[in-house]
Amino acid sequence: MKRIIYSIYVDIPAAEHYGTTSKSKHDTTEKAEITVDAFKEHYDRLIKCKTVYADRIGVSFKMYEYDNQYKEFETKFKENYPEVTGYEIINFYKLHLLNELSQTYDEVLYLDFDVIPMNHSPNFFEEWDLSKGICVVEQNDKIVHHVEASQSIRSPTAKYYNCQAMLLDGGYHPNNDVINTGIIGASAEHI
């Protein structure tokens, strides 16, 4: 069985982390700069921990960065959706890559750049039966049901209600789960 782990690092400007639509007082450029700086400072270590993990469990690892493939994806995305931030484009790009890798690999594991597999972490592919579906963590417990509360555009609550609106607009039932896509495991048949 062919398996791969992949991650993405694109150094997007701090101002693009939240865009102009977030109303949360916590979504500041200063906060985003802390993240950007930490990624730069720990860049080598964040890649190494993933390559070590992949080697230990005997699977391939691929790191995607700001290259021509990403630039082409970003350009097309901005043409069609100019209101989308760089942060959001990366999130769509990781799903695009998940689909692309499923054409070559039987099972695929995506790890956000800040995910750190520990030395004692078990083999993800042996722990999770990906023949049963896509492996993600739901965050329904993080939904705030007080509509007066101000939410970040990236908060689980905003994602929940935005998804409800899209489902209703499409004529579907509005029930949905809030998913953390920082770690995604899937088999090619489910992608």
Annotated model-derived regions:
Residues 166-191:
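Catalytic core and acceptor-binding pocket of nucleotide-sugar-dependent glycosyltransferases
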Residues 58, 110-112, 178-183:
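Extracellular structured ligand-interaction cores
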Residues 2-3, 132, 180-182:
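Short, surface-exposed beta-edge/turn micro-motifs
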Residues 10-13, 67-71, 115-117, 141-143, ...:
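Short, solvent-exposed loop/turn segments at secondary-structure junctions
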Residues 1-93, 100-104:
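N-terminal anchoring/stem segment of glycosyltransferases
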Residues 86-155, 185:
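GT-A fold catalytic core of metal-dependent nucleotide-sugar glycosyltransferases
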Residues 153-168:
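Mixed-charge, low-complexity intrinsically disordered segments
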Residues 47-51, 119-126, 170-173:
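Intrinsically disordered, low-complexity boundary segments flanking structured domains
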